[in-house]
Amino acid sequence: MNRVFVFWVLIVCLPTMVANAQEDSELQRSSDEHMREELGVNPITTPSIHDTLKQLEVFRPVPVALIDAANREATFNNRFQTALHFGSLVADGFLLTLAERPQAIQDVGKALIRQSRALGVGERLTKRSKSLLEHSDKGDWAGVRQELVRTQEDVETSMLELRDEEMAHMISLGGWLRGFQLGANCTADAYSPAKARILGNVEIMDYFLDRLDTLHPRLKKTDMVTALTARVKEIRALAAEAADKTMTREQVEKIRDLANAAEDAATAKVDEEGRFEKPKN
C-alpha cells in the first residue's frame, strides 16, 4: 500500500520537479552570464583555446629552445605575476602540442597544478592536469588540446566563483603575451608575411592595455607593471605603424626584442612593494 502511494506521489510530482530543475538550471546559466558580464569575462577576456591554437599553428618551427629556457618552477610573492605565469604556461602548452613534445608537456602540466594551487583553484585543475599528462604520455595531441580547452573552461568557472576580475584578466594577458613572444621569435627567425600579419592585431593589444590601466593605482605604480605596460605600448606603436600593411622583418625583429623585454618584466623577481630586485653578486 505504501509503495503504491509513493508511486502515485512521484507520478503527480515528477512534472513539477522536472520543471523546477529546469528553472534552477536556467537561473544558474543566467547568473553565470550576469557574472561574466559584470567581471568583464567575454570572448576577448578568455579567448577560445581552439581559436588561439588555430592562430598559433602558423608559428613553425616552434621555438622549443625558448620554451625550454623558461623556469617552470618559478614562484612569485604576488598574485599578479602568479596569474601571468599561469597564462604563460598554458601558452607554452599550446606550442608544445605543435612540436609534439610529450615530456615537456608533462612538465608544463605539473607546473600548472602548482600554479593553480597558488591561485586558489588547485582542486578543480588537479584532475584536469592529470588527464592532460595521460594524453601527452600516449601522444594523443588532439586529447591534449581538448584538455587544454577544458582547463581554460575550469579556470573561467573558478574566476566566476572567486569573483576575481584582475586574476581573470591577468591570466589571459599572460597567455597572450607569452604566445606573442614565442610567435615574434619564430617570425623573426623564419619570416613570412602570414606570421607577421598575426602579430599585427592592435585591437587585442588595446584591450590588454586597458586592463592594465584599470589595475589598482598602487599596483600600477610598481616597477613590474610600469615596465610591462611600457613594453606593450611600444609593441602596439610599432604594430600600428604598419597599419593595413604587413610588418617587415625589421619591424618584427624590433617587436621580438620588446616582447622578450615584456616577458622579462612579467617574470622578474620583485620585492613586496613590486620593485625589481637587484641581481646578487
Predicted regions and their residues:
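Positively charged n-region of N-terminal signal peptides that target proteins for export
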Residues: 1-4
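Extended amphipathic alpha-helical interaction segments
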Residues: 139-221
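N-terminal Sec/ER secretory leader and immediately downstream segment
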Residues: 23-132
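Short, charged, amphipathic alpha-helical segments
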Residues: 106-110, 130-131, 170-173, 195-200, ...
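Boundary at the C-terminal end of the N-terminal hydrophobic targeting segment
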Residues: 19-21
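A cross-kingdom marker for long, charged
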Residues: 216-281
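Secondary-structure edge/capping motif, primarily at the C-terminal ends of alpha-helices
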Residues: 93-100, 119, 123, 158-162, ...
